[in-house]
Regions:
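Anion-binding (especially nucleotide phosphate/pyrophosphate-binding) glycine-rich loop
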Residues: 2-159
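Phosphate/pyrophosphate- and phosphate-bearing ligand-binding catalytic cores of soluble enzymes
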Residues: 15-16, 21-25, 163-312
Length: 312
């Protein structure tokens, strides 16, 4: 649908027919009918008001990962969250509190934390996207989840049109989920995330790939060591976004590792005719286990490098 009215002059710049491909990690996708890049909370309010006055659909865009845009684009207003105030990292006894704007590059924040010798997010290095997207999915990798360090999430509540702060418990964090992608999907727009890190915590080395990486090392790895190790491991799997490398372009891991009853493990082992202990799995509480989706996909006949037509 085309909107013949001209875009009126605003403090916020609203563009028309903006290609979305450059804003996604896949580098594909059609145009946004209207596009606004917001750098302050005031601009965010203004952009929402712009959409409401014209009865436009709203899509909030962060770092552009975990996202596939149709060639037809988006017939509404795309709000690109580019709020990037300086990150605050404040020591408080055995803890460190940090306040981070939603538009901050996630990996850059992880690096900043690790460079100060602080553990808590070192295993989340190399995950594409911005800080504002991390609480939505409760991103996790290599034995860590971002929810373990989040204390507060500041948001714009689209129902009340007011900025509110949601506590850790109010966010309803679970495995790859929160209220932001389930019960309250499309209600809140994240503008800031507060973290708390334990200064006495040791780097997380529970993941098998990390244990193999540091096997035989005499000294205990630092958070920065783990940061670089995780990025190297991700790069080796084609899971690190690297400009100029065609094999390192993706939307991130967009599937969830299934959590199932322990009895399912025996069934899979019988089907594959292998011992159950040969199947990688982790305890998930209350008689349940977590299975790696990538491993299951490969055993189902979709090995690395599988292609179907132009997709693969």
């Amino acid at each position: 649908m085309l909107y013949p009215q001209a875009v009126p002059p605003l403090a916020l710049q609203v563009q028309e027919f903006v290609p979305l491909a450059p804003y996604t990690t896949f580098r594909i996708g059609g145009p946004a009918r209207f596009f606004a890049e917001v750098t302050t909370e005031a601009e965010l309010l203004e952009s929402v008001d712009f959409a409401r006055q014209r009865h436009l659909k709203i899509f909030t865009l962060g770092g552009g990962s975990n996202l596939l845009v149709s060639d037809s684009g988006f017939d509404g207003l795309v709000i690109h969250i580019a709020i990037k105030t300086p990150t605050q990292i404040i020591p408080s006894g055995n803890f460190v509190d940090s306040t981070v704007a939603a538009g901050t590059d996630w990996n850059a924040f992880v690096l900043e934390v690790c460079e100060q010798g602080i553990s808590g997010v070192e295993c989340l290095a190399g995950i594409p996207g911005s800080v504002g997207g991390t609480p939505v999915q409760n991103v996790g990798a290599y034995g860590q989840e971002v929810a373990s360090t989040i204390t507060l999430v500041r948001t714009l509540d689209l129902e009340s049109n007011a900025f509110i702060a949601l506590s850790h418990d109010e966010c309803g964090f679970a495995y790859r989920r929160s209220i932001f992608n389930t019960t309250h999907r499309n209600r809140y727009i994240v503008t800031q995330v507060n973290f708390r890190f334990d200064r006495t915590a040791k780097p997380n080395l529970t993941y098998a790939d990390l244990q193999r990486h540091f096997a035989g090392q005499a000294t205990v790895p630092t958070p920065l060591d783990v940061y670089h190790a995780v990025r190297a491991i991700r790069h080796g799997k084609g899971m690190l976004i690297v400009e100029g490398e065609a094999d390192c372009r993706s939307a991130g891991s967009f599937f969830k590792n299934p959590v199932v009853e322990e009895s399912v493990l025996a069934g899979i082992a019988a089907t594959l005719q292998i011992p159950a202990e040969k199947i990688p799995h982790w305890p998930a509480g209350e008689g349940r286990i977590k299975l790696p989706a990538a491993w299951l996909l490969e055993r189902a006949g979709f090995p690395k490098g599988f292609r179907m037509g132009e997709a693969g």
